[in-house]
Every structure is written in structure tokens, then in C-alpha cells.
Amino acid sequence: MSNENNHQQAQMLRGTAWLTASNFISRLLGAIYIIPWYIWMGTYAAKANGLFTMGYNIYAWFLLISTAGIPVAVAKQVAKYNTMREEEHSFALIRSFLGFMTGLGLVFALVLYLFSPWLADLSGVGKDLIPIMQSLAWAVLIFPSMSVIRGFFQGMNNLKPYAMSQIAEQVIRVIWMLLATFFIMKMGSGDYLSAVTQSTFAAFVGMVASFVVLIYFLAQEGLLKRVFETRDKINSKRLLVDTIKEAIPFILTGSAIQLFQILDQMTFIRSMTWFTNYSNEDLVVMFSYFS
């Protein structure tokens, strides 16, 4: 028992170290990439940053409601089943949730894509914001199912794949952003809207890389086959309903800050046009500074 406890503690420490490294690298990349990105955007930098921020505000809220706190619940359930020596229940659970979250991702991705013109109009920007939000819909499509796999590894107390997937996501995202922006602004058409659209589409490219890393670790550790081959039966429908009920308070509290940011976005340009003579372009630039 003592050896098992020591092993679990060591595994937890390693996992904490991996997550710390992942968070540090992600924040470092976030602080560094903006410098060349801003320079390459040239005179359009402030407006490009404003459009980027507006797209991401809505995108972040869609990510929040599309996952609905379920990955954390998955981690708790997997940890519970493993403690009870019922690992097959864990694999059956993941298979059920993967199907459910894939469907959820599809629904919310379609909503974001189809309602982008309406959301862009509410933001006061118009058609410039539409392709940016539509490019982010692709990331919404796969994020829910990817987050389930992350929750599975968290429940297995194996945080290395979780952290490695985060690192891969951020590294590939930043590489795509910078390469696309450089080629468009410095060697191509110079269309800053296309550069911003590719910069937001980079979220999807990064998630694909993250998904590949997670699948690799599942296969390497012999877990992928067990997820799809297990015949263990669980009451997944009831578990889904119970999980969503538990997640509702987290959705409400977690989305509060995001909703305030969206409210600012939806009212800033419209209210400023009522009381000032600034152009729409000037107001987008101001929004980028204030946000």
C-alpha cells in the first residue's frame, strides 16, 4: 500500500510539473507572437487586433457552453471507476461521451457559422467580422470531443498527454498564425482581413495537432483499442443528464466574465456612434486598445 501511495504521489508530482511547463510555454508564446504579428500587420495592426479580439470573445463563449463542464465530470467519473477497479466502465464512459460531445461540437459549430452575420452585425462591425467568426467555427467543431480525451487522461492521473497536447496546440497555432500573416502581408496580397482570418483559423489547426497528440498517447499506452472495443454497459444517458445538471452552475458562473466582455463588444461601437463622430474603423481601433 505504501509503495502504491508513493507511486501515485510521484505520478501526481510529474503531472503537476508537466502542466506547469505547459502553462508557462503557452503564456510565453502568447506574449511573444503578438510582436511580429503586430509588426507585419503594419498600418492595419490595431484594427486587425480589434477584429481578432471580437472574434475570440464570441468564440471563447461558444467553447465554454459547448463543453458545459463535462470534461471535469469525465475526469471525476474515470477516477472513481479506476478506484473501484472498474476500468471497463471508464472506457465505456469515454466512448459514450465522445459520441455525445462530437454531436454537441457539430451543433455549436453550425450555430456559430450560420449566425456569424447576425453576431457581426450586433457587434457593430459588419461583414469584416463574418469570415473571422466562421473560421473559428471549425475549432468549436472538434474542441468538445478533444476535451473529453483530456478529461480521460486527467481522470487516469496521467497529465503528461494532457500537457503535451496543450503545448502542441499552442506551438502549431502560433506557427500557423505567423507564417500565414507573413506570407499574406509581406509576400502576398497584403489583405489584412485574410491575415486575421488565417490567424483565427489557426485555432483549428492547433486543435488538430492537439488531437493527434492525444490519439498518439492513447494508442501508445494501449488505451485506444480498449475504448472502442469494450463491451461494458453503463447507463450513459442518465450519466449524461446528471453530469449536465451538475455542470449548469459552472456554466453560469464561468460564463459571467465572458458574457460581460461580449456585452461590451455588442454595445461599444453602437453606443459610441450615437454620441461621437468617430468612424467605424476608428472605433474598432479604440476597441482593440480598450480590450
Predicted regions and their residues:
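Alpha-helical transmembrane segments of multi-pass membrane transport and lipid-handling proteins
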Residues: 95-119
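Small-residue-rich midsections of specific transmembrane alpha-helices
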Residues: 55-77, 141, 291
